[in-house]
Amino acid sequence: MSKNKGDDAPKNGGRKRKNDGDDTQKPNKKKSPPPPQDDPVHIFFPLPNPNIFSQMFNGDGNGKDDVPAKYKALKEKILKLNLDDKIKERVLARLKNVDSDKHKHLEWFELLLKIPFKKYAEIPVTKTDHPDRISKYFDDVYDTLNKATYGMQQVKEEIVNYVAQIVSTENKNMPRIIALHGEAGVGKSALLRRGLSECLKRPMKNFSCGGIRDSAFLNGFSFTYSGSRPGAIVNGLIECGVSNPIFFFDELDKISTTNDGIDIQNVLIHLTDPVQNNNFEDKYFDGIPIDLSKVIFIFAFNDIGLISPILKDRLHIINIPTPSIQEKVIIGTKYLTKELYPNIGFNEGDVVFSEEIMRYIITQHCEHDKGVRNLKRYIETILLKINTARFIGQKQKYKSLKNKLTFPIEINRDMVDELVDKNKNEKDEFFRTLFI
C-alpha cells in the first residue's frame, strides 16, 4: 500500500491533494512578504530567514549560536537596549567578528551600551498635576532665574514661556530653538546653566563653536579609521545620561567661513531639523540611528551677521541687553562676589565690596568692558591676593593690606589700585579682542 502511494503521487501534486484543506494556512506559516527594496537593513544585511532575530537570540535552531560563548554577557546587554529589532540584528552581527580586532570592537560595543537610548529626564510637573503644585513650580522657576542673574526680565519671560510649553506638551513636541544674542560676558551662559537647566532639572552640555575645526568633532569618525571615536553629540548624550538634555552651543558666530566651517554649519542645520534629527547618525556608529528630537538645543552668539541664513531662520532669537553701570554694580556686589567667595575659601562677609567701590572698579579699571567678564576677573584677582596675604602674614608685599588682614576686610580704593594691575589687564583685553 505504501509502495502505490509513492509510485502514484508526484512530489508536489501528491502533497497538494493530501492537504487541500490546509492550502490557505500553510503558505502563511512558511512564507513572508518580501522586504521593501529601500530598507537599508536588507540592502546591506540580507536576511533570507524572517526568524533570524529569534535565531540570534536562541541560536540557529540546531542548538548552535554564532556568537562566541565568551561574549554571551555582552550579547544579553545588547538585547536589552531600547532599539528596534532590526538595529539589534545589525549590532549583534558585529559580535561574530570581534576577535579580528578585539580591543577596537569591544570598545565600540562598550560605547554603544553607554548611549541612553529612550532614557529621558522627567519634567518636574505635568499639566495634570494639582494647580497649587504647578503654581508653586513656576514660582520656583522665577526665583531660580532671578538667582541665576540680575535683570534681563524680558529674557526671563521668554524662558518661562519656554518651560511652560514643555510642561503643556509633556515634552512630546520639540519647542522652538532659542538663540541668545548679546555681547560677551553679559550672562548668557549663567542664565542657562544656573537658570534653565536648574528649572527643568536636566543636565546641560556646553559646546564652544569657536573651538570646532571639523564637522567630525560633532558627528565622529568612521569606525574603520585608526583611533576613531564617536563625536561630541554622542559623547554629550553619554555624559548627560539622558536622551533629552540641554545642548548649549556658544560662540556660534565663531565658526569659520571655510569649507570645514560650512560642513560644521550643515551638521548644526541637521541637528535642528525636526524632520531629520530623530535619525541622527554618528559616523562611528554607522547604521545606528540616534533620536535627538527631545534634545533642547540653545545657541548664543555676538554677531548676528555671521550666522548661516538657513540656521538663523530656525532660531528664535532673544536679544540680551548690555547692562548699565548701575546694573553692573548690582551684579558685582550681589552675584559675582557670592559666586567667587566659596571658590577661594572665604565666607560671605569676610571681604566686603561696597557699591561705591564696585562702581570705582567698573569705571576706572574695566570701563571698556561691555559685559561683566573683566569685572569678575578683577574681583577674583583681589580676593586671591588677599587670600594669599592672610597666610603669608607680615611678609606679604602689599602696602594697602598692612595691618588690615583682620576679617571682615572692607575693600577701599588703595587696595583696588594696588591689587589690580590695570596695565596688565588692559593689555590682556587688547590681545584677547584681536582673536574674537
Language-model segments: which ranges?
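AAA+/P-loop NTPase substrate/partner-engagement loops
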Residues: 198-228, 236, 327
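Conserved catalytic/switch belt of AAA+ P-loop NTPases
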Residues: 253-290
